[in-house]
C-alpha cells in the first residue's frame, strides 16, 4: 500500500514528466495526469501514433518519470521519481481522467496508464532529505 503522504502529494498535482527510451536514446515529455490511488496508476492522454513519447512507450512499455513541486525553499522541496509500465487505460481509469479534466471530453483523447512499479518520494517538509518508497507487489 502506498503511504498516504505520497498519495496526497500525487492527488494534489496534475503534471508529470514521462521519460521513454528507444535505441538507448532517452526522451522526456510533460503530461497531465489523473492519479488512481487504489491501483497506484497514473492516467495520461497521448496519441501513440503521433507523439514521440507515445510511440516509444508502446514499443518499450518500461517508462520512468517525475512529479515535482517547484520551489526555491529547500525546506519545502517535494517530489517523486518513478518507474512503471505503460499500457492502455481501462474504463475506470478513463472515467477518472475525464472527471479530473472534463474539458478533455471534447477532444476524445486516447487515454493510457502507467502502472507504478517503484516510486521514491522526497519530502523535505518532514525533515531534510526525508524519503518514502513504494514498491509494487507484482
Predicted region positions:
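A generic structural signal for short beta-strands and their flanking turns/coil linkers
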Residues: 12-16, 29, 38-40, 59-63, ...
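Charged, amphipathic alpha-helical segments
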Residues: 1-4, 48-52, 95-97
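A short mixed-secondary-structure module that forms the rim of ligand-binding clefts
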Residues: 34-72
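Charged, gly/pro-rich active-site loop segments
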Residues: 74-138
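A short, Trp-centered hydrophobic/proline-enriched beta-strand micro-motif
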Residues: 8-23, 63-67
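Hydrophobic residues embedded in beta-strands of well-ordered beta-sheets
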Residues: 26, 40-42, 119
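A generic structural signal for nonpolar/aromatic side chains embedded in well-ordered alpha-helices
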Residues: 10, 55-57, 97
Amino acid at each position: 500500500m502506498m503511504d498516504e503522504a505520497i498519495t496526497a502529494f500525487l492527488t494534489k498535482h496534475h503534471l508529470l514528466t514521462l521519460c521513454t527510451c528507444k535505441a538507448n536514446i532517452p526522451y522526456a515529455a510533460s503530461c497531465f495526469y489523473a492519479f488512481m490511488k487504489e491501483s497506484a496508476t497514473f492516467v495520461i492522454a497521448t496519441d501513440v501514433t503521433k507523439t514521440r513519447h507515445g510511440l516509444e512507450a508502446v514499443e518499450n512499455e518500461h517508462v520512468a518519470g517525475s512529479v515535482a513541486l517547484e520551489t526555491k525553499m529547500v525546506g519545502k522541496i517535494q517530489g517523486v521519481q518513478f518507474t512503471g509500465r505503460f499500457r492502455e487505460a481501462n474504463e475506470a481509469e478513463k472515467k477518472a481522467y475525464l472527471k479530473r479534466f472534463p474539458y478533455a471530453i471534447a477532444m476524445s483523447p486516447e487515454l493510457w496508464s502507467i502502472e507504478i512499479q517503484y516510486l521514491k518520494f522526497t519530502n523535505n517538509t518532514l525533515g531534510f532529505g526525508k524519503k518514502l518508497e513504494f514498491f509494487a507487489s507484482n
